[in-house]
């Protein structure tokens, strides 16, 4: 075991002297289905999470849904007030495709949906809060899913049409665009697995065919912006990929190679086509999948190839790399292997992962406080992909519903994470901002309301969905204001206020 992994947990008080750049963008993040509610309000169409939670409620741990969630559809002004309380520079949120285009297609634009997001964006800008907008955060219109969703070869065209409508309506004010949030979770958990909607569980090809369709759709939405809107609107467009760090368990060549294969399977499928110099799917992993496919009797690889034209089209389709980061895993070529469906993406990777028991555990079984995790990920990506601009678009910590307002574990996590951010900046990573997940407690997908990530507690039982700041909100507010991480800072009150200028 590598000694630095344990030593890295120690946070030295001298870190408090290091400053974030004055132009570093601090914010928080949310997603439409997780907070908005109003699932059928004012002409909104059904999306895949509406459909799954209504027809298969047992798919959610507590049998809940996002029908009301935090009711941001009616409470968006309170949400912006919370942003002002924290002193945020930016707020990352997603648009509900079905709220804008109820049927998913471009022929029927819902004016009420457009008005809602106009009001939301204008309320932020009134207080100098920069909107960072995600086009797709997992809530596909159900009509498009009925037609095959991401697997339909027309999907990139549908997404391009949607993106164009969004740019036309909001691009005069929105200057930071993200096409997709977390392709791995979309493709593996929704198509290759049965954890997230649409829960197709097509383990052999679902992940791979979804991945190709998604990156093609991303490129089409990117080039629509570049060719038709960028000159007049002056914004930037990227994609957000979940990049947790994969470290070799030992210094052996076998474990180092296993860690690299796991990185390719986890996020390389989505990053390599866009950010690498060669384009296309990761070479080593695609060769593994092809070999196993032939051994399993498939007439061709279960991972589709890009044509030369497609590869060149996708390659370089970005202005920045959005990184959602939460934790790390130690990867072994032989030990700690779990059973996976055969064939599937993780059976193809065929590696084991280990989490040391001394790493602090959150309410989510997959989320621990791993040492210097953000720095490890970002410096690796910087070297691999020729120093793109980065934003941390999600990073956060989960608590159980009864955790209360004194969330010292979340504070410990954020301080460690932000120290790792400073390490990355000092290492030369071109990191422009950090979005904490999340502004408020919300519907946590298949876990319902059993795992909560908010800086603000939400009383989901109250008609008003009352928001109350947790202790971590005050600590994050102080970091934003001072631009330093003071490990000894303790808020003197849990009564929130808005500073002058916000």
What spans do the regions from the language model cover?
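A common structural microfeature
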Residues: 6, 23-25, 73, 90
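Short secondary-structure capping/turn segments at boundaries of alpha-helices and beta-strands
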Residues: 15, 79-80
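Active-site region of glycoside hydrolase catalytic domains
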Residues: 17-60, 84, 103-105, 111-502
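Active-site mouth loops of central-metabolism enzymes
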Residues: 61-75
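Beta-strand-rich binding-surface signature
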Residues: 80, 92, 121
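Short, well-structured secondary-structure segments
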Residues: 89-96, 130-134
